[in-house]
Amino acid sequence: MFTQANLFLVLLLVIALIAKNNSLILAVSVLIGIKLIGLDQKIFPVLQSKGINWGVTVITIAVLVPIATGDIGFKQLGEAVKSSYAWIALGAGILVALIAKNGIVLLENDPHITTALVFGTILAVSLFKGVAVGPLIGAGIAYLAMQAVKFFSG
């Protein structure tokens, strides 16, 4: 029962409790619960392979709720395109999506980078009250930085 993985999860739970980070508390508790009831061999591979896509889908649904409720409509869209901030947000959205695209490739092809990114995300979430939406974006930024290092060093 006292495996390295379990010890790591308990340590993360303690850090999450100290940092009062509800998202990390819930995430670690769910993983510990799945392990305790013995479904980890079946559920973890699915969570690992599909979880990011599910998370992006849930975030997308949450972002689209104001459209579904009618709080945001064509009138607000028309008003937004007149705002310089809206154009900045549009550009940022495009840029982040393109950066994240490269992040997926990096995460799939370089497991030790995945470990560093996940640990960085855990630190940011637990210690700095960050939000764990960053692994794809973080991987994309890491990919761009690696390409820049390659370009300038060789």
Swiss-Prot record:
A GO-annotated cellular component: plasma membrane
The UniProt record lists the keyword Lipid metabolism: no
Alphabetized PANTHER family for the sequence: UPF0756 MEMBRANE PROTEIN YEAL
Secretion signal span: none
Record's protein name: UPF0756 membrane protein BPUM_2558
Bilayer topology annotation: Multi-pass membrane protein
Primary location: membrane
Family: Belongs to the UPF0756 family.
Residue ranges that the Swiss-Prot or TrEMBL entry lists as coiled coil: none
Species: Bacillus pumilus (strain SAFR-032)
Localization annotation: Cell membrane
InterPro entries the UniProt entry points to: UPF0756_TM
Swiss-Prot/TrEMBL keywords: Cell membrane, Membrane, Transmembrane, Transmembrane helix
